[in-house]
Regions:
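Soluble metallo-hydrolase cores and metallopeptidase-like ectodomains found primarily
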Residues: 3-120, 140
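Active-site-adjacent mobile loop/cap segments within catalytic or ligand-binding domains
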Residues: 202-229, 258-336
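Alpha-helical metal-binding/catalytic segments enriched in His/Glu/Asp
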Residues: 92-94, 108-161, 322
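Sec-exported extracytoplasmic/periplasmic mature domains
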Residues: 1-4, 133-143, 168-177, 245-256, ...
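Solvent-exposed loop/turn segments at secondary-structure junctions
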Residues: 12-16, 99-101, 112-116, 155-160, ...
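Soluble non-cytosolic domains of exported or imported proteins
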Residues: 102, 121-132, 143, 158-162, ...
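Metal-dependent peptidase/peptidase-like ectodomains
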Residues: 154-267, 273-277
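Second-shell loop/turn segments in exported
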Residues: 77-83, 113-125, 153-154, 181-182, ...
Length: 337
């Protein structure tokens, strides 16, 4: 059967109130150094990013647009006006049940919330589309998998990974339990790995000294696969990341993949001390996105019309990468018509 066994995880979104920060007086320090590097370069090492990353080169200021009038489109302005409210939330998932090992699964995820008064096209309509397309492909009636695959669309990522953290909290202790006993049913198969997709389209290179980023996808664009060295399962996650790179080497049509050790700020993070966990992105989150390489990140310009076919093709190659890797890991077969 297909991925029709849709379920929901219900949780309570109840963070403490955000502190109202006082703006510090004076001017902010310059984003980029004014003096040359010790070796005479114009710009070099330029601070640290999240996840243990180091930033090199020119940076571009980043942040979340919260001003409604920054979005000229009235429909999008209205769509973005709702602020996160504490209360009950849910997120949807479905499962391709394995034929030989239904009690084991890989989790494939993306977050479906967004902010910044845009359309959330890249962050994270792009990752959401990949998960839905992979669910469609694997759910074809002529596709069998030995192991199970769960496709999850997280909520509340932008507010602090709340939806994925709730999933881990509620379900980690239920892994591999047959319920009811003797039924052959496993509501929460044992986690073999978690793969997150978050911002898949835009790899136009570093900003220049004027803060501008190229309008075009760069010739060196690639799919960035990240694991986190500072996690309990770093070695297993590293192996999973390189397995995905080898799948890209074998099957991607347009763009290669690169592996980095600083996975951060996305829904694979709550999983990383429980199961091997990786993220796929347009750039490394710490040293690239964190340095302002994507000028549409959390901005009103994160719109479908912003991105080109070359941008969308990078997302497609990430989908090819995950499809090829997971198909091998779950022993997928296609029966003859």
């Amino acid at each position: 059967g297909g991925c029709t066994n849709t379920e929901r995880l219900v949780y309570t979104f109840d963070p403490p109130p955000r502190p109202v920060g006082r703006r510090s007086g004076g001017t902010r320090p310059p984003l980029n150094p004014v003096d040359p590097t010790p070796t005479g370069g114009l710009v070099g090492r330029n601070g640290s990013g999240p996840g243990g990353s180091s930033i090199f080169g020119y940076r571009r200021r980043t942040g979340v647009v919260r001003a409604p009038l920054a979005q000229p489109n009235e429909t999008l302005r209205a769509l973005n006006l709702e602020e996160p409210r504490n209360g009950e939330r849910s997120e949807v998932f479905c499962t391709k049940v394995g034929t030989t090992n239904p009690d084991e699964m890989y989790i494939i995820g993306a977050h479906m919330d967004g902010h910044g008064f845009g359309e959330a096209a890249n962050d994270n309509g792009s990752g959401t589309a990949i998960v839905m397309e992979l669910a469609r492909i694997f759910s074809a009636p002529d596709v069998q998998t030995g192991r199970s695959i769960r496709f999850v669309l997280w909520n509340n990522e932008e507010t602090g990974l709340n939806g994925s953290a709730a999933y881990v909290e509620q379900r980690r202790e239920r892994q591999g339990l047959e319920d009811p006993p003797g039924s052959g049913r496993y509501p929460e198969p044992r986690w073999l790995g978690m793969i997150q997709h978050d911002m898949m389209l835009f790899d136009h290179g570093a900003p220049g000294p004027d803060g501008r980023v190229s309008r075009d996808q760069r010739p060196e664009a690639d799919v960035n696969i990240e694991f986190q060295t500072d996690s309990a399962l770093a070695l297993e996650s590293r192996d999973l990341a390189f397995f995905f790179k080898s799948a890209n080497d074998a099957y991607a049509t347009d763009y290669p993949a690169a592996v980095g050790p600083h996975m951060t700020n996305t829904d694979s993070t709550p999983f990383m001390n429980v199961t091997p966990a990786i993220s796929l992105r347009e750039n490394e989150r710490g040293m690239h996105i964190g340095a302002g390489w994507d000028p549409h990140w959390h901005q009103p310009t994160d719109l479908y019309v912003t991105f080109t076919d070359d941008d969308f093709r990078l997302g497609l190659n990430a989908a090819q990468t995950t499809l090829a890797a997971i198909a091998q890991l779950v022993d997928a077969t296609v029966s003859a018509p």
